């Protein structure tokens, strides 16, 4: 409570605080950074690691007004103010020369920007998604990158002081309502702007470029078979579309109509195209047929045929039909650098997945993900045929799922102050009703939702409310840093099993997936030592005949705890347990799914899976940890020492790990990408960390090795 009282005081102080002037962010205390609302920096600004910009972005979370006019900074770095939602006003450095890509991405309260005279380049997506940006003034003639000012819903005035139009990508102003924007330029230069790429869109004279798509260049993941008939007449996508769907495909028909509306101009209630102009005027009749075909070899298999007058998609199941639609959607989008494609060549796709589980894991415990933002994550997953969303709902830092039997868990353990050096309020949880709705929403996209409740470690949030869960029975505060706690649930205390049983009873009712994840990781050195001295744990070991004293006895005790919970989940709730594999596990309980996650220890985990006749999902850190930076110096610039997981490293993942066909047939469960959120402090940052690596993961999980090519993927 004391921490939240102090936050209220800080917020009150911040609201009345006048602009603070300092040379650099290091001149402010942590508390003043957190409370700052208005700042002026005058020094030479640092741009790497824990730079002035990283501190402005991640530590000064309440910042609304920033004056950098007197600061020395030739280059505003990439992601400088990425998704800083409070920022309203900024004065850029007078001597600025370049604005990096995504520098102000999703700063959705920013109201005005003036680009200084000396700026020569505005990077890709630099101001994309600044929804309340009303006025843009460009004093020089900088080159404007792809989507530099895209998706600005509120922009009303753009003033350019150069008589010669600045060079602009065709997509520089994509997603802007051109009719609602006043473009002001020097007298006598309108003719040049009318003809200039990027700028001509403001005059309503140039149709945005559309083209015949190149299927080989736009499909991710790569399909098993693709045959293009380049000599045949392409399908012109603008026309009067109707969708004909077999029984049982009502959901897929809705998706088909949505895709056609978004990509070709739409359908009205009678299946007629609502788009004005184009082939629709001529009354081109186009049909999309959705059907089931039981002869296909896999439950997710589909065929897609593009004909001159329509599209035929067949699937073994509704899931296969849906994935055919996702492939069609990508064909309509082309390479995504333009508004879309006018035509698709006649072709046939025959496709099915290599693995049947292609998962992403998100972590709302370290930094909470609001419900609507969590929902927004789903369509992009489905677009690339990712089909499992793993929710890490419990950890040392928060308990984020409502448990009606234990209301104190969310009342007291779902909020805290700060995450490492980010002194900000972090709070939120999901109600059971929200999760029921979320599960149903995901099902429409053929994604199943798997909840995770950690045990026996990573449970400090629960322990902070119910100290009787621990060996010493001492209340511990919620953890506000990353790392591993030395607290465990007490294996010798029957309340632990009662508590977990009640939690899983409610989860089993909310989440219909056949899988529940039990955690199980990082309960070893030194944490298991708390079981060594616990009288209850010692008594249980004696009862079980566990007599070894080389610390293996504690792993055996963890095995006992797991055995009891696994038996409960199987017999009462018909669930298949999952857990993170540790090399100290000497057995994998029959029927369970284990995760190979520790970097450098994947082979050991796979061998254990084979020896135990178990299924295993691959998410090794060196390939699949998407919270890690994608390149040196990338976000998160400050972390606990994360290595780099590059796009190439993710793409290079071989789900079979060279173990052969028998392993792939009998043991391989799937692949997963993990998004731990210790250093991810906004929903937009989740997307930044997830993509494009999730695309590489999708191809690794779906596409057969012989069809994959790094050069083709790029």
Task: Give, region by region, the residue ranges found by the protein language model.
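Bacterial Sec-dependent N-terminal signal peptides
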Residues: 1-20, 212-213
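Structural signature of tandem-repeat unit edges
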Residues: 37-45, 62-75, 85-98, 107-121, ...
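Consensus positions within tandem repeat domains that build extended binding/scaffold surfaces
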Residues: 79-80, 100-103, 123-128, 146-148, ...
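Acidic, contiguous N-terminal accessory segments
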Residues: 210-356, 571, 577-581, 714
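Conserved, mostly hydrophobic/aromatic
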Residues: 243, 317, 360, 381, ...
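Feature activates predominantly on carbohydrate-active enzymes
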Residues: 295-515, 531, 564, 672-676
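Active-site neighborhood of glycoside hydrolase catalytic domains
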Residues: 467, 479-592, 599-602, 606-607
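Flexible, acidic glycine-rich loops studded with aromatic residues
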Residues: 577-583, 587-714
């Amino acid at each position: 409570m004391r921490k939240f009282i102090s936050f209220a005081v800080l917020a009150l102080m911040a609201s009345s605080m006048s602009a603070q002037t300092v040379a650099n962010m290091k001149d402010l205390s942590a508390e003043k950074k957190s409370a700052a609302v208005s700042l002026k920096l005058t020094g030479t600004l640092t741009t790497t690691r824990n730079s002035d910009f990283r501190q402005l972005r991640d530590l000064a979370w309440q910042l609304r007004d920033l004056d950098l006019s007197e600061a020395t900074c030739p280059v505003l770095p990439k992601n400088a103010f990425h998704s800083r939602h409070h920022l309203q006003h900024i004065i850029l450095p007078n001597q600025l020369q370049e604005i990096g890509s995504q520098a102000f991405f999703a700063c959705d309260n920013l109201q005005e920007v003036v680009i200084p005279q000396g700026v020569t380049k505005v990077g890709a997506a630099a101001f994309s998604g600044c929804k309340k940006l009303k006025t843009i003034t460009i004093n020089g003639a900088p080159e404007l990158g792809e989507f530099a000012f895209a998706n600005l819903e509120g922009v009303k005035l753009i003033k350019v002081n150069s008589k010669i139009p600045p060079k602009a990508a065709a997509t520089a102003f994509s997603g802007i309502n051109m009719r609602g924007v006043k473009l002001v330029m020097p007298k006598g230069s309108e003719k040049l702007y009318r003809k200039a790429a990027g700028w001509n869109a403001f005059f309503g004279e140039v149709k945005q470029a559309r083209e015949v798509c190149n299927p080989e260049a736009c499909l991710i993941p790569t399909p098993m078979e693709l045959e293009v008939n380049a000599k045949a007449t392409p399908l012109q996508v603008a026309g009067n579309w109707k969708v004909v769907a077999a029984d049982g495909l009502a959901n897929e028909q809705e998706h088909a109509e949505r895709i056609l509306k978004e990509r070709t101009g739409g359908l009205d209630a009678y299946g007629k195209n609502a788009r004005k102009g184009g082939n629709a005027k001529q009354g081109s009749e186009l049909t999309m047929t959705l059907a089931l075909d039981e002869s296909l070899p896999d439950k997710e298999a589909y065929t897609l045929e593009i004909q001159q007058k329509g599209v035929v998609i067949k699937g073994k199941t509704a899931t296969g039909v849906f994935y055919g639609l996702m492939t069609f959607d990508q064909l309509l989008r082309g390479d995504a650098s333009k508004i879309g494609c006018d035509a698709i060549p006649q072709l046939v796709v025959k496709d099915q997945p290599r693995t049947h589980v292609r998962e992403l894991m998100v972590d709302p415990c370290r930094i909470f993900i609001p419900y609507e933002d969590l929902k927004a994550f789903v369509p992009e997953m489905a677009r690339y045929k990712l089909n499992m969303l793993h929710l890490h709902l419990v950890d040392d830092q928060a308990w984020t799922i409502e448990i009606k039997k234990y209301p104190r868990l969310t009342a007291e353990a779902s909020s805290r102050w700060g995450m490492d050096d980010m002194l900000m309020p972090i709070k939120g949880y999901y109600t059971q009703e929200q999760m029921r709705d979320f599960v149903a929403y995901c099902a429409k996209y053929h994604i199943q939702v798997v909840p995770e409740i950690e045990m026996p470690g990573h449970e400090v949030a629960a322990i902070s409310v119910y100290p009787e869960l621990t060996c010493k029975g001492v209340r511990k505060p919620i953890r506000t840093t990353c790392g591993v706690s030395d607290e465990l649930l007490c294996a010798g205390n029957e309340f632990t099993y009662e508590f977990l049983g009640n939690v899983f009873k409610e989860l089993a009712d909310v989440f219909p997936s056949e899988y529940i994840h039990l955690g199980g990781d990082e309960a070893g050195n030194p944490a298991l030592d708390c079981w060594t001295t616990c009288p209850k744990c010692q008594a249980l070991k004696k009862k079980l005949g566990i007599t070894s004293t080389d610390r293996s006895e504690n792993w055996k005790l963890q095995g006992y705890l797991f055995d009891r919970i696994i038996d409960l989940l199987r017999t009462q709730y018909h669930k298949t347990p999952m857990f993170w594999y540790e090399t100290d596990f000497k057995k994998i309980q029959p029927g369970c799914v284990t995760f190979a996650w520790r970097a450098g220890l994947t082979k050991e985990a796979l061998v254990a899976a084979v020896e135990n006749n178990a299924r295993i999902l691959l998410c090794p850190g060196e390939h699949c940890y998407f919270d890690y930076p994608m390149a040196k110096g990338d976000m998160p610039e400050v972390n606990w020492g994360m290595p780099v997981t590059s796009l190439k490293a993710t793409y290079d993942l071989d789900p079979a790990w060279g173990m052969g066909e028998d392993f792939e047939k009998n043991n391989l469960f799937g692949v997963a990408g993990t998004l731990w959120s210790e250093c991810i402090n906004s929903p937009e940052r989740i997307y930044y960390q997830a993509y494009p690596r999730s695309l590489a993961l999708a191809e690794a999980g779906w596409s057969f090795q012989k069809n994959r090519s790094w050069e083709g993927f790029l």
